[in-house]
């Protein structure tokens, strides 16, 4: 029997509709939520991501400011622009699209964003606050994954969860959110010895390591929930995740597809973070 599909597009549509209503109420009160997106260089994938984020804002009643710069923009000029956005009352969230050109220190740039406008949740103030369970913002991708688990009413308390991938953007915050939900969490990576020894006992697997087919049917517990965060290309050039979808869907209880799974939820939670920033500033959060 095939696994139940957790449809990221459908869930994102539902959450965005609710966000649009909240945004309309804010706008009517003179506080339209605003997101500034900063893109440096001409990376094709980054251009697609930025375009999707700006469109999501426009489609749901948010103000968006797209700041495009050539790849040779100096670090000092980028920091100066971020300072301007920090002080712009129309902007409630600032997103700097990664990766940045090599001559720019991405850590320094992310730390320059005011924590109350750090809607990606990457600033050390928010990353640290996540440890205590009280961040201003949760990183968008793991936040979206948690919403997907919530949508199937999965009982995380006491569940065994394995996160494959330990990045600051997904793996580490994902593990922290699962811990806070009461799960027993193991973090693995691409170099973990005997990955199967960990995943075969997992009730929930989150694959976020960026390696195609690292999760196969033979290492998944029957009935497990499998969340695929990976973004790769198969031999035909088609988008695929870290999970062997065709095989694993015959074993798992629930599974997310790629595309149409975590991706739409990531942008949706960016809207939610921006909305909450605007509500806080308006004094109604």
Swiss-Prot record:
Keyword Transcription regulation annotated: no
Catalytic activity: (6R)-5,10-methylene-5,6,7,8-tetrahydrofolate + NADP(+) = (6R)-5,10-methenyltetrahydrofolate + NADPH; (6R)-5,10-methenyltetrahydrofolate + H2O = (6R)-10-formyltetrahydrofolate + H(+)
InterPro entries: Aminoacid_DH-like_N_sf, NAD(P)-bd_dom_sf, THF_DH/CycHdrlase, THF_DH/CycHdrlase_cat_dom, THF_DH/CycHdrlase_CS, THF_DH/CycHdrlase_NAD-bd_dom
Any Pfam family the entry gives: THF_DHG_CYH_C
Signal peptide limits: none
GO annotation, biological process: L-histidine biosynthetic process; methionine biosynthetic process; purine nucleotide biosynthetic process; tetrahydrofolate interconversion
Superkingdom of this protein's organism: Bacteria
Residues that bind NADP(+): 165-167, 190
Gene3D superfamilies tied to this protein: Leucine Dehydrogenase, chain A, domain 1, NAD(P)-binding Rossmann-like Domain
CDD domains: NAD_bind_m-THF_DH_Cyclohyd
Keywords in alphabetical order: Amino-acid biosynthesis, Histidine biosynthesis, Hydrolase, Methionine biosynthesis, Multifunctional enzyme, NADP, One-carbon metabolism, Oxidoreductase, Purine biosynthesis
Coiled-coil annotated residue ranges, if any: none
Pathway terms, separated by semicolons: One-carbon metabolism; tetrahydrofolate interconversion
GO cellular component, one term: cytosol
EC number: 1.5.1.5, 3.5.4.9
GO molecular function term, any single one: methylenetetrahydrofolate dehydrogenase (NADP+) activity
Family to which this protein belongs: Belongs to the tetrahydrofolate dehydrogenase/cyclohydrolase family.
PANTHER family referenced in this protein's UniProt entry, alphabetically: C-1-TETRAHYDROFOLATE SYNTHASE, CYTOPLASMIC, C-1-TETRAHYDROFOLATE SYNTHASE, CYTOPLASMIC-RELATED
Physiological role: Catalyzes the oxidation of 5,10-methylenetetrahydrofolate to 5,10-methenyltetrahydrofolate and then the hydrolysis of 5,10-methenyltetrahydrofolate to 10-formyltetrahydrofolate.
HAMAP family to which the protein is assigned, alphabetical: THF_DHG_CYH (MF_01576)
The protein's assembly and partners: Homodimer.
Name of the protein this chain belongs to: Bifunctional protein FolD
Provenance organism: Cupriavidus metallidurans (strain ATCC 43123 / DSM 2839 / NBRC 102507 / CH34) (Ralstonia metallidurans)
